[in-house]
Curated annotation (Swiss-Prot):
Role of this protein: Component of the type II secretion system inner membrane complex required for the energy-dependent secretion of extracellular factors such as proteases and toxins from the periplasm.
Protein name: Type II secretion system protein F
GO CC annotation terms, alphabetical: plasma membrane
Membrane topology: Multi-pass membrane protein
Species assigned in the record: Xanthomonas campestris pv. campestris (strain ATCC 33913 / DSM 3586 / NCPPB 528 / LMG 568 / P 25)
Pfam families: T2SSF
Complex formation: Type II secretion system is composed of four main components: the outer membrane complex, the inner membrane complex, the cytoplasmic secretion ATPase and the periplasm-spanning pseudopilus. Homodimer. Interacts with XpsE and XpsL components.
Length: 405
């Protein structure tokens, strides 16, 4: 069985640091609870030399998404166990493996010990914690339900991270497939095909038009391969720079939404983000207008962000959220209907979270369907291109062999 390291609080509030063999981290937590301890952290042990994980070495900022989720969950657990806030932060300060995270937690603890609320301490971390995070903590402080607020916040962050990871993971295999076959095609055109071109030129044989075309492309790739390699990189840098231009990005995002397949996927994904954020904020007591202002910052499509900004103005003037979002005609009808039901029933936060569940599931299913169709299509197209190149250079050789025979 794998070896796990754990940190736990005993009945006297002292931190225990140890190891045990278990099938999974849930078993470690259960065995610690049976011993009367409160599990704070469980993770697979590193190698014998205690070397840090690659993820820790590559982390550039104190808290990545996974670390922020872990920090929030652990803080909720400690507060729920009756630990004072400054004591809980002191315990958490010893858990991270990197010095940057320890310094951040220490600074937050010192600010709290100075009499400031947690939300103010987080706000002083120069943008490390999002407005959503800070406002939810502030709402929890006002409502006296810090543990529940932190647990909901951890759940929100975990769901957001999982959805983002789903999208990224779906793109990895097609990207690798394109890269591998693209390199093989470049090698075929830039090295193999020119060998045939020289051979046919020395034999002075008549070639079909399609063979001549492939040989010309092969010679072009051989002579200008460096330019052909650099062009995509330059184009990518140009597009990245253009996307920073507000007008260009707005036009591009609006155009993407009008595309049948990708536009529908983007709309579902952004709807899930918006409704998950709004529902979580409203459930924690953040006013609707403030929640809308925060929620639009988690969206990436500028066209939909503009629709949400316009909806905020309408809500300010007394209109309902569903009707205000409907004016842009970009959000899915089902989402608008579910939001309207929530407004009419007085359970807007609940319906927003249910809407998020629905569209997160739809997004995941849409990605799976797209991937199931895209990978075979890419494979078929690239295999056909490679096959046509091979056939086009071998057909004249076959004809020549038959003529000699």
């Amino acid at each position: 069985m794998p070896l796990y390291r754990y940190k736990a609080l005993d009945a006297h509030g002292e931190m225990l640091d140890g190891q045990m063999e278990a099938a999974n981290d849930a078993e470690v937590a259960l065995r610690l609870q049976e011993q009367g301890h409160l599990p704070v952290e469980t993770r697979l042990a590193t190698g014998e030399n205690g070397s840090p994980s690659l993820r820790m070495l590559l982390r550039k900022k104190p808290f990545d998404n996974a670390a922020l989720v872990q920090f929030t969950q652990q803080l909720a657990t400690l507060i729920g166990a009756g630990q004072p806030l400054d004591r809980a932060l002191s315990i958490l300060m010893d858990l991270p493996e990197d010095d940057k995270s320890r310094r951040v937690i220490a600074d937050i603890r010192d600010t709290v010990r100075g009499g400031a609320p947690l939300s103010v301490a987080l706000e002083r971390q120069h943008g490390l914690f999002s407005k959503l995070y800070i406002n939810m903590v502030r709402a929890g402080e006002a409502g006296g339900s810090m543990q529940d607020t932190l647990q909901r916040l951890a759940d929100y962050l975990e769901r957001s991270r999982a959805l983002k990871g789903k999208v990224i993971n779906a793109l990895i295999y097609p990207a690798i497939l394109l890269a591998v076959v693209g390199c093989a095609l470049l090698f075929l055109l830039g090295y193999v095909v020119p060998q045939f071109a020289q051979m046919y030129e020395s034999l002075d044989v008549a070639l079909p038009w399609f063979t001549q075309a492939v040989l010309s492309v092969g010679l072009l790739v051989r002579d200008w391969w460096l330019v052909l390699v650099v062009i995509p990189g330059v184009l990518g840098l140009w597009l990245d720079r253009k996307r920073r231009n507000a007008a260009f990005r707005a036009a591009l995002d609006a155009w993407l939404l009008r595309q049948k397949v990708i536009g529908s996927l983007i709309a579902r994904l952004e709807t899930a983000r918006l409704t998950r954020t709004l529902g979580t904020l409203l459930r924690n007591g953040v006013p609707l207008l403030a929640a809308i202002g925060i929620a639009r910052n988690v969206m990436s499509n500028t066209a939909l962000v503009e629709d949400v900004a316009a909806a905020a103005d309408d809500v300010k003037n007394g209109h309902g959220l569903s009707m205000s979002l409907a004016r842009g005609k970009r959000f899915p009808r089902l989402a608008l209907q579910m939001i309207q039901v929530g407004e009419e029933s007085g359970a807007l936060d609940t319906m927003l979270l249910k809407t998020a569940d629905t569209f997160e599931l739809e997004t995941a299913q849409a990605i799976d369907r797209a991937l199931a169709a895209l990978v075979p299509l890419i494979t078929l197209v690239l295999a056909s291109v490679v096959g046509l190149v091979i056939i086009s250079v071998l057909v004249p050789l076959y004809d020549l062999t038959n003529a000699i025979g």
